[in-house]
Amino acid sequence: TNVQDGAVLHVSHQGKFSDRGHPLSIGEDVTIGHRAVIHGCTVGNYCLIGIGAIIMDNAVLEDYVMLGAGALVPPNKRLESGYLYVGSPAKQSRPLSENEKEFLRYSASHYASLKNVYLKEGSES
C-alpha cells in the first residue's frame, strides 16, 4: 500500500452523533492518490483512490475498486468490487477490465518499490 503526498487518513471519534466512532482500515496493495481524504472507512485490497477523492465515515470499498479523481463517497455507502466509480456522490460507472484489475495489483507494489531506489540514492550521496 502507498499513500501519496498530501493525503489525509483519519478515524472518526465516538461522541454525541456517533455511538462508537469509525476506525480506518486499509487493505493490501492499495494506492491512495495525492490529496485524498480517507475518513473512518474501510478500503479493501487492490483499490486505487484517485487524486483528491474523499471517502466518508463507515463507507466500504470492496476489493478491486477504482475511485476516480475528485469522487465523493458519502457516509455508509458500499462500493461493489470490480467497478470504476466517479462523481460526487460517487456512482458506479462501469466494470473494470482484466487489464485494469492487473494495473491495480501492479500500482501499489510499483510505488512501494520506488522507496528502495530512493533510499539507495540517498545513501550514496
Segments the model singles out, each with a brief description of its role:
Residues 5-24, 34-125:
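Glycine-rich hexapeptide-repeat left-handed beta-helix
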Residues 31:
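Short proline/glycine- and basic residue-enriched helix-capping loop/turn segments at helix->loop/beta transitions
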